């Protein structure tokens, strides 16, 4: 699965009868949804971008100077003048120079002098700013079912589907082939202040250098370089890259300050680099909150017969995935398709299956299958696939796992924020409370009661509530009632 190869992975486990779960997706992360009677699905936010954003300013990094002209007057002869002073795109400077008999003036003193030069910009020496439009930013969400096929990190799963969202998008339904349909309704949020963000892009001149950065609007507007808007042939403040020398009689030198690319690159050190792909300008941060509908998902292979236990061989022995799960792959030499008999037992309890399958109903197909992912309780375990067996020690502790999943649940609820609550009606408010409880405590509840059936959990919740009602000690009564209520809510709830 896609999530197996990513470091930032989260699990959302639906309760009995779950038809809808709420996910928080961020760039670089991946969420695996598991629900009883449904195929497991990986969902992740693949990209945030805008196609062809609007240009704001262009800055010139290296001036191109031409057609230098100088005019001078003797003392008392009035100001020197050039027609170029009134032309757009020309940089001029007025000054006074020493005049006398040695340079063709009858009087000694200060005479007027003016120099002008035509200023343009060298080719491939521009820095252009682009602005995002929140209404045009596209959020790409990808969905992939767990099919039992091993897919390398650099390969694409054949069952992978893509949905795109903007601020005005409606619900999207994706068809996952034999696994049914999944619906997505996503609320989008960028991780940056778009009104104050500019993408600064340089003309490409060297392959080893980055070409775009994500900068603040005020910093961009304060750059001390010549600038213009798109379509304007003339540069504003072109004098910023031109220097005039000291006047000498009828002469004034004009100097080009040279290429400013190095100065700009030094100023951009440490600034987030922007990614540009064709005409797509990508954002580096952001998230989407998605309501995922699971009601039309269906399990594949339920009608298959069980595989012959004696005809399995390890292709990849059980390995730690890095996500508190175990992954493995087997080959099968018997008749296909069929269902893989897989289970795990803890040390000292040979009759209790402790494996929580992330790959539900693993199968061998005519053209693939055999990849299995499962979660095991901490401690010594034995994994069985048919007649194959493998000793496995799962690191960690049950208490630590509960706290970790609770922390992730709180983080999810915090990111969802105000969208998690519905104050429009009493029913909506109480439904929001239920969803919040599932979001925060769902992972921890599944860690504790993952191997317990629906009916035992229901009876346990009823028993705790009954004890609370019949206990005379107020503190114990409230404790039993709260615990029983939580167990019943997590067992009977349909939201997560």
From Swiss-Prot:
The chain crosses the membrane at residues 448-468, 480-496. One of its GO terms (molecular function) is protein dimerization activity. Residues 469-479 are cytoplasmic. Gene3D superfamilies: 1.20.1280.260, 2.60.40.350, Tick-borne Encephalitis virus Glycoprotein, domain 1, Viral Envelope Glycoprotein, domain 2, Viral Envelope Glycoprotein, domain 3. Disulfide bonds join 3-30, 60-116, 60-121, 74-105, 92-116, 92-121, 186-290, 307-338. GO terms for cellular component: host cell endoplasmic reticulum membrane; membrane; viral envelope; virion membrane. GO terms for biological process: clathrin-dependent endocytosis of virus by host cell; fusion of virus membrane with host endosome membrane; symbiont-mediated suppression of host innate immune response; virion attachment to host cell. Glycans are attached at residue 154. The keyword Membrane applies. Pfam families: Flavi_E_stem, Flavi_glycop_C, Flavi_glycoprot. The keyword NADP does not apply. Keywords: Clathrin-mediated endocytosis of virus by host, Cleavage on pair of basic residues, Disulfide bond, Fusion of virus membrane with host endosomal membrane, Fusion of virus membrane with host membrane, Glycoprotein, Host endoplasmic reticulum, Host membrane, Host-virus interaction, Inhibition of host innate immune response by virus, Membrane, Suppressor of RNA silencing, Transmembrane, Transmembrane helix, Viral attachment to host cell, Viral envelope protein, Viral immunoevasion, Viral penetration into host cytoplasm, Virion, Virus endocytosis by host, Virus entry into host cell, Zinc. It comes from the Viruses. This is Genome polyprotein.
């Amino acid at each position: 699965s896609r999530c197996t190869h990513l470091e930032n992975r989260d699990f959302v486990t639906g309760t009995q009868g779950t038809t809808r779960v709420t996910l928080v997706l961020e760039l670089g992360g991946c969420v695996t949804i598991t629900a009883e009677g449904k195929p497991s699905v990986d969902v992740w936010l693949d990209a945030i971008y805008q196609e062809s954003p609007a240009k704001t300013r262009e800055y010139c990094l290296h001036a191109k100077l031409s057609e230098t002209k100088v005019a001078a007057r003797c003392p008392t002869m009035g100001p020197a003048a050039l027609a170029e002073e009134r032309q757009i795109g020309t940089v001029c400077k007025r000054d006074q120079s020493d005049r006398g008999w040695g340079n063709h003036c009858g009087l000694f003193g200060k005479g007027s002098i003016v120099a002008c030069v035509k200023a343009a910009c060298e080719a491939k020496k521009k820095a252009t700013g682009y602005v995002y439009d929140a209404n045009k930013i596209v959020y790409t969400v990808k969905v992939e079912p767990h099919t039992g096929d091993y897919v390398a990190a650099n390969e694409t799963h054949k069952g992978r589907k893509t949905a795109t969202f903007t601020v005005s998008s409606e619900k999207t339904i994706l068809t996952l082939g034999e696994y049914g349909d999944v619906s997505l309704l996503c609320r989008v949020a960028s991780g940056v202040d778009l009104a104050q963000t500019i993408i600064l892009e340089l003309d490409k001149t060297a392959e080893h250098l980055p070409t775009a950065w994500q900068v603040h609007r005020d910093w961009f507007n304060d750059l001390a370089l010549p600038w213009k808007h798109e379509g304007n042939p003339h540069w504003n403040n072109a004098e910023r890259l031109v220097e005039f020398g000291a006047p000498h009689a009828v002469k004034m030198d004009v100097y080009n300050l040279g290429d400013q690319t190095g100065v700009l690159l030094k100023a951009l050190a440490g600034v987030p680099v922007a990614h540009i792909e064709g005409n797509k300008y990508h954002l580096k941060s952001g998230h989407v909150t998605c309501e995922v509908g699971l009601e039309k998902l269906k399990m594949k292979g339920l009608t298959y017969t069980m595989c012959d236990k004696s005809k399995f061989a390890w292709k990849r022995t059980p390995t730690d995935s890095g996500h508190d799960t175990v992954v493995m792959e087997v080959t099968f030499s018997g008749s296909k398709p069929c269902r893989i008999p897989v289970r795990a037992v803890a040390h000292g309890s040979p009759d209790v299956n402790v494996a929580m399958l992330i790959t539900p109903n693993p199968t061998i197909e005519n053209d693939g299958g055999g990849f299995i992912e499962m979660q095991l309780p901490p401690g010594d375990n034995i994994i069985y696939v048919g007649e194959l067996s493998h000793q496995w020690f799962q690191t960690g502790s049950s208490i630590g796992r509960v706290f970790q999943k609770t922390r992730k649940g709180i983080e999810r609820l915090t990111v969802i924020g105000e969208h998690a609550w519905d104050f429009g009606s009493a029913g909506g408010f109480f439904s929001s409370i239920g969803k919040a409880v599932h979001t925060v405590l769902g992972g921890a509840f599944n860690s504790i009661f993952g191997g317990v059936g629906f009916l035992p959990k229901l009876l346990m919740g009823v028993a705790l509530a009954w004890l609370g009602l019949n206990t005379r000690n107020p503190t114990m009564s409230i404790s039993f009632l709260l615990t029983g209520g939580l167990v019943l809510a997590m067992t009977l709830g349909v939201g997560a």
